[in-house]
């Protein structure tokens, strides 16, 4: 009986370790799951527009990263952006499409803000866990986000 419990416990531990970051979130291979969304960091340096276009081609519904609370931001920092060379990644927040009406590229409402002031696109400074406006023509690493 003791051996059965030991084996069962071992199988449970193995299953949980292989089941991904969050149980119940089914993401494509290489993507990390959190709160019904999937995330993947890319080390390529691209402009904001090129990174957004790239994200939309990766997975159905995928766009540049949108953040809606500090817990999500912490998840992204801990699990996806370790490859960012300068600790700065593009976010989907921009007024490029709406001229002064800020909104996420995935259409989500802007319900969480953590920026300081400067241009038309936003970067996420992962070491400081804050956002900065910047010129959209610069190149940065980026994270794509997709519904699970």
From Swiss-Prot:
Its main location: secreted. Disulfide bonds join 27-38, 55-144, 121-136. Keywords: Disulfide bond, Glycoprotein, Hemostasis impairing toxin, Secreted, Signal, Toxin. It is found in: Secreted. Residues 1-23 form the signal peptide. Residues 34-145 form the C-type lectin domain. Expressed by the venom gland. SUPFAM superfamilies: C-type lectin-like. GO terms for molecular function: toxin activity. Pfam families: Lectin_C (PF00059). The keyword Oxidoreductase does not apply. Glycans are attached at residue 130. InterPro entries: C-type_lectin-like (IPR001304), C-type_lectin-like/link_sf (IPR016186), C-type_lectin/snaclec_domain (IPR050111), C-type_lectin_CS (IPR018378), CTDL_fold (IPR016187). The keyword Translocase does not apply. SMART domains: CLECT (SM00034). One of its GO terms (cellular component) is extracellular region. Interferes with one step of hemostasis (modulation of platelet aggregation, or coagulation cascade, for example). Heterodimer; disulfide-linked. Shows greater sequence similarity to the beta than alpha subunits compared to other heterodimer snaclecs. Belongs to the snaclec family. This is Snaclec 6. It comes from Bitis arietans (African puff adder).
